[in-house]
UniProtKB/Swiss-Prot annotation:
Coiled coil: none annotated. InterPro entries: PPR-containing_protein, TPR-like_helical_dom_sf. Signal peptide: none annotated. The gene is claZ. This is Clavilactone A biosynthesis cluster protein Z. Part of the gene cluster that mediates the biosynthesis of clavilactone A, a meroterpenoid that features a unique benzo-fused ten-membered carbocyclic ring unit with an alpha,beta-epoxy-gamma-lactone moiety, forming an intriguing 10/5/3 tricyclic nested skeleton. ClaR, ClaS and ClaT are sufficient to produce clavilactone A and the function of claZ, if any, has still to be identified. The biosynthesis begins with the prenyltransferase claS that transfers geranyl pyrophosphate (GPP) to hydroquinone to produces geranylhydroquinon. Residues 405-440 are annotated as: Disordered.
Amino acid sequence: MRLAGEEFQNTSRYIALEKIISLLLARRCFSEAMTVYQRMLNENFQPSGDLNVELLAISIAASSVSEGQLERALDDALAHPSYTETGLLRLLDLLAELEISPQFRASIGQRFVEARGTGYSPSVRLVSKLVGIQARAGLVEDALNWLVRDDPETAGESPAAPKTSASYPYASMISAMKDTQSENNTAIDKILDHMRKHNVPADISLFNALISLEMRRGSPANALSLYHVLLELSKIAPITPDVFTFGTIFSVFRPRFRAHMRSVHTRHYKPANNKVSLREVYRDMIRYHSSRPIPSQFSSPIITPSILNVALRAFMSFSDYPGAFVVLRTFSMFKLRPTLRTYYIVMKYLMNRVRFDLGRARREGESRWGDRLLGLDWLDVKDVVVDQTLAEKVLAFGDRADLGDNENINQNRNRKDGSRPPFSKPSIAHIDGDKPLPPGQPLDIIPLTRIMRRAILADSKLRLGDPNSPAGDAQFSPARKVTHAIAEAKNAMIPEYVMQPCPSPDKRARKNYV
C-alpha cells in the first residue's frame, strides 16, 4: 500500500533527502541530484540555503542561459545573511565542474564579499580560492588588489578551517598557473615582489607551489635548486619541508626526467648538477621526521605508505636496488604495512628490466642482470617468454630465505611441528588488478625484501675487497656482498641518530634493520 505524502513529512526524511542530494553532488551526478531535488519540492520540503543555491546554479546552467543571467539569479542568495563561506566555496567548485569561466566565478566571490559590507573580512581559505581563480584567468593585478584589501594576517578564520599562513594565498595564485608559458614569469615576479613590499614571510606552502611550478615546466634542475634553498633556509627559520615537498622532489627522479638525471650509457644513477642525490633526499626526509619537537618512531605526518611508495618508485626507476631495499625496510621501521601498490611498483620495474635484458641482441657468452636474476644460462635466454608465469616465478623468490636473510632466525618456533606459515603476499592477478585482494588481508614486506636481495646480487658490479687482486672479490660470499651493498645504502639514507627499528608488525622479523 502506498502511504500518503503527509505521512512522510518528518525530519528524518528531510535529512535523508538532503544527504542523498549532497552525496550525488559530491559524485557529480547532477541530473540524479536534480531528480531528488524535484522530489523534495513536490513533497513541500525546502532544501537548506547552501544546498539550494548549488541546485539553483545547476538548474539555471542546464537551461543554457548567459552568465549574466546566472549571476542575476544568484544575487539574492549570495547577499542573504545566512549564506556562508563554506557554501560559497562549494558553489565555486561546482561552477568549475560546470565549466563556468574563471572570470564569472571571481565575480561571484566579489559579489558575496561586497554584500557583507565593510566590516566583513573573508577568511584566508576564501581569499586563497578567489585569488587562485583570478590568477588562472590571467587577472594577476586584480588578485593582488584583493590581497591588499583583505590582509590575510587579519582575516577571519572559522574554528574548523585548516591552519593557514599569510603566504598561503600567494601560493594559491602560483599553483593556479597551470599554463607554463614564459609570460607567466612576469606574473610570478609580480607576486613575489608584492610579498616583499608587504613583508609577507615565505612559508612551506609557497616553496611547494614554486617547486611544483618548476616541475610542471619540465625544469627538474630548478626544482632541486629551490629545494636546496629551502634546506638552507630551514637552518635559520621555522620552515621545513613537508610530505608534499618530498613527494614532489622524489618525482624529479621519475623516468619522465631521466634525460636530466641519468647517463644514456648506463642504467645507474647520475647526480644532478647541483649534487642533490636521490639517497640524500631520502635521508633529508628521515632527518626532518626525526627533528620534530616530539618525535615519534611509529607516527609521522611525513613517513606514510604513500610517500614511501613514491620514493620506492624513484629508486626502482634508477635500478638502485640497495636504496629500494632500505625504503622497503622503512615500512618495518615505522610499523607500516606495504600496500598492493608497493608490490606493483617492485614487480613492474623488475619485470620491465627483465623484458629489456632478455629481448636485446647479445654477444656470445654475454650475461645480463635479467639472466642472473632468473638464474639462466645465456644459452637458455632465447627460450624464455616474459609473461605472467615468469612474473609469478619472480614473485615466488619472496618465499625463499637465503642471502643472509635475518628475518628467518627462530622461525621454527612459530609452529609446534617446526614449520612456519609463509609471509602474506598477493598474487600477480592481485597486483595486476585482475582479481581483488580479499578484504582485510594484510600484506608483509618480507617477500619484497627477499626479492630485492636477489636483484642486488644480480648486479654484476657488486664487488668487495681489493679490486686489483684477482681473488679480492671471490673471497666474499654472495650474502656478504648483498649485506655490504645494503649497509652502504643505509649509511647514506638513514641518519645515525635515528632510532633503531622495532620488529615488523607481524612480530616475525626478529633481527636488526640490515
